Amino acid sequence: MIFQSSSRLYAAVSSLLWPAILCAGLTGAYFAFRSDMHLLWFNVVYLSTVAIIALFERLMPYEKTWQKRDGETFNDIAHTLLTKGGVQIAAAIGTSFPMAVATVAQPALSYHSHFWPDQWPMAFQVVLGLVIAEFGLYMAHRLAHEHLSLWRFHALHHSVGRLWVINTGRFHFIDTLFKIALGQIPLYLLGAPLPVFLWIGAVTAFIGLLTHCNVDMRTGPLDLIFSTPRLHRWHHSKVLAEGNTNYGENLVIWDQLLGTFHNPPRPSSTDIGITGKVAKGFLAQLAQPFSRKGRKEIIGKKPKELILQEEQAAKAAAARRNANAKIRKSG
């Protein structure tokens, strides 16, 4: 570490890093989209952002124990290449699962297509698209936590014992397809133009890297709007009362509105992972959710200590809700 965590310089860097990296990434995406080879240059910007974040993970880590190798780096990269690479190939050839579904459904809903405000400035269209897509992403994420038929695929993402920039894209491809479908089909049906999808993809890519990074970032009021590292660490907690919260992909607007926002005034959890067991190899991880034995291994059995933690967390959450209700009544 170059500077002490108690120094003013450290505090300033920690507070500015999240917005600075996001703005830098989106600025790079702007120039990439204006080029003739926008996917190539976008990937250059994306990988450069990964390198910068990886550097800060060494300089100012949130959790030092997460710097130790866990034997999953190859699997993390392989899943990223399969899911994110597949999405980029689909974008390059102009076809994807949600687009195919929308193409079939749009004739019956053609009166919806002119609802999209394409006369608005692109920045406002992107913000609108983010909010609409976020609802689908939120629901896909929440359903994946609340239903075992979907959790068996999503558990792969939560199976790691550390968060760092390289396991950002650690998703089962079925999980990814489900999220993309719920997030993008509504936009296709509404007639959103291609640039809106490109910009939503860029925002999602860079916020995803930041959300999963092991960097000590002080995000403060940004936690009320965006999905930040602090909020996402709570989401990866082994304790269900903490883990089944903060489902937002980019924004936490739907968490705020639907009662799943969680940000208690204490350091976010570092006890992350799942109570079940995920296979070791890349191909085995892809196949595991499809077998009965694999599903049982993924679900696992909760240890007594974890059950006690969950009960305590649930009681604390109930106490906070009651206290807030009393304050509102007295006001």
UniProtKB/Swiss-Prot annotation:
The pathway where this protein functions is: Lipid metabolism
Instruction: Enumerate the UniProt keywords alphabetically.
Output: Cell inner membrane, Cell membrane, Lipid biosynthesis, Lipid metabolism, Membrane, Oxidoreductase, Transmembrane, Transmembrane helix
InterPro entries tied to this protein: Fatty_acid_hydroxylase, Sterol_Desaturase_Related
Cellular component aspect of the GO annotation? plasma membrane
Signal sequence bounds: none
Family statement drawn from the similarity comment of this UniProt entry: Belongs to the sterol desaturase family.
Q: What is this protein called?
A: Ornithine lipid hydroxylase OlsE
**Annotated source species:** Rhizobium tropici
Q: Which gene encodes it?
A: olsE
